[in-house]
Amino acid sequence: MKDRMIESNKQIYQPIMKESNMENEKTPLYVAFSTQKGGVGKTTFTVLAASYLYYLKGYDVAVVDCDYPQHSIAGMRKRDAEQVGADEDYKRMAYEQFTRLGKKAYPVLCSSPEKAIATADEYIAAGHVPDIVFFDLPGTVNSEGVINSLAGMD
């Protein structure tokens, strides 16, 4: 039943995916939420969008956390893992959730804005081909590499 629901959702959301010209292999969609102001929810929106599409809609996603130096998403993931590791009830709940979903947490890759696209490309070249790669960029276009990273988005 779950597989049919995922396939049904993929048919609905198919327009957001792109196909490469080489043997119709899937090419990930690169997405970033950006604004020149910090503290307006870009990281929160990135996590919500990635989590919704991954856990509820069945898409394979990855997140490139290039909000250097704080790497908020990677830091949040680390704190969550530490909290789960320190509490038996959280361990049980996490195990039940991941067992029910049949998947682990989506990957979060740390990078810098100037290396963000290369980080995603290397991940994909290593054989990990998600449907969508989200990029969490700094809250200013004055940071080195932000403009070039934005130019690489779909």
State each model region's role.
Residues 1-153:
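P-loop NTP-binding core
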